[in-house]
Design a protein with these regions (language model features):
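Negatively charged, low-complexity tracts enriched in Asp/Glu with abundant Ser/Thr
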Residues: 2-38
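Compositionally biased, low-structure terminal segments
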Residues: 13, 69-71, 84
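Residue-level detector of alpha-helical secondary structure
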Residues: 18, 22-25, 77-87
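Acidic, low-complexity, intrinsically disordered interaction modules
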Residues: 26-80
Length: 88
């Protein structure tokens, strides 16, 4: 059964956001803003030179408490591995 996302610490990261960021990373995109299925706006930032990855949620132009500062590509990889295990 496919789950709708994963918990990262105390926060829920929706599956559609994970999938979108995975696609952006495959394409080499370093920054993107889009509207998720939840109606929130999401911003992804990646700085490949240092491995920094940040995913921030906005509603009405204001940053929400739902943000994910992975800090490194390794931390993002751990989250993705957890997500992929749920798909099996």
């Amino acid at each position: 059964m496919k789950r709708e996302g994963i918990m990262v610490g105390e926060k829920f990261l929706p599956a559609d956001i994970i999938e979108h960021v995975l696609n952006l990373r495959r394409l080499g995109v370093q920054k993107d803003i889009w509207k998720g299925y939840d109606g929130y706006s999401w911003m992804y930032t990646c700085m490949p030179e240092c491995g920094y990855i940040d995913i921030v949620c906005y509603r009405g132009g204001l940053q929400q408490d739902i943000s994910f500062d992975f800090g490194t590509s390794a931390a993002w990889s751990v989250a993705v591995d957890e997500y992929l295990k749920l798909l099996d």
